[in-house]
Amino acid sequence: MIYLDNAATTLHKPPQVARAVVQAMDTMGNAARGAHGGALEASRTVYGTREKLARLFACQRADHIVFTANSTEALNIAINGILHEGDHAISTDCEHNSVLRPLYRLEEERGVGLDFVVADRQGRVDYGDFERLIRSNTKAIVCTHCSNLTGNVLDIARIGEIAHRHGALLIVDASQTAGTIPIDMEKMGVDVLCFTGHKGLMGPQGTGGLCIRPGVEIAPWKVGGSGVHSYDRHQPMEYPTRLEAGTLNSHGIAGLSAALDVILERGVEDIQQMEHGLMRKFYEGVKDIDGVTVYGDFAAPVRGAIVTLNIRDYDSSAVSDALSENYGIATRPGAHCAPRMHRALGTTEQGAVRFSFSCYNTEQEVEEAIRAVREIAAE
């Protein structure tokens, strides 16, 4: 199989990841729940992984990195823990439902004000709209770093400057960029960075988290066992315990730690360069095929390793099925949990076929994918 669905999850991971998970299952106890060897090993692994993530994202404090099951949970924690009745938030048409649905629910249930920066037919935003939508009660701007549909990358540093100039926080969904595009929380002005472990970070599914700037207060979304202060009625308020009620996925975190070793040794810039080259090769190979429409801004200097397209008026699911059944190529059709972006692109009925690349793909695989698109378009 030629796997080109890396924006959904990376299938091909460093072999160290699986080995680390198996070893953890054989040796680890429960982190912060005891002083025996197994519990201490789990605690060391968890904290060591926090330190690696802090280094990767330039997060000021490792103890302000909170583990979750995925970026959806991380975003729910951040959005629900920061926005309250009377607050206002700004988001964009570029968002995944993991941002949209928590915001919609707060709009309905807490009366949180909500405005969106619209995207054009190429999925681009006007940064002046962020400034125009700011209100006196704007508490946060919540936005993705990279659209999971178009691959367009937002200028997070520019958005962060606008947010902070008006006293608002910046919450960033880094699901599509963590591990594949350099992220510096300090330089970009990110207050809360939400990430998942199973995509560009090449870790196991069931891992993710938040990186929180010191001074940012997030109310606990869930409370319960913490391993410390057990006689207190309330959840401990220090990070990361404040937001980590219950047993952590230490086995998955061990796998994530192994993946981070590979990324930190290789360098995110090197991974980005390779993935960009594969993406660009595919784009150049399909953009002029008769009947093919490609979505997104390919003139931008920085973008995710994503190419989304349609072939004539063919249903996107039918095209994706043909790619899988006739060519052994895995892609993602449909709506991609990005309804506002599909409306901006005019693809709500047809959907679109997304090709997404990783550093484990090859140029030969890209050439096979180009050939497949050309042949389907000729039918």
Describe the function of each predicted region.
Residues 1-379:
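Pyridoxal 5′-phosphate
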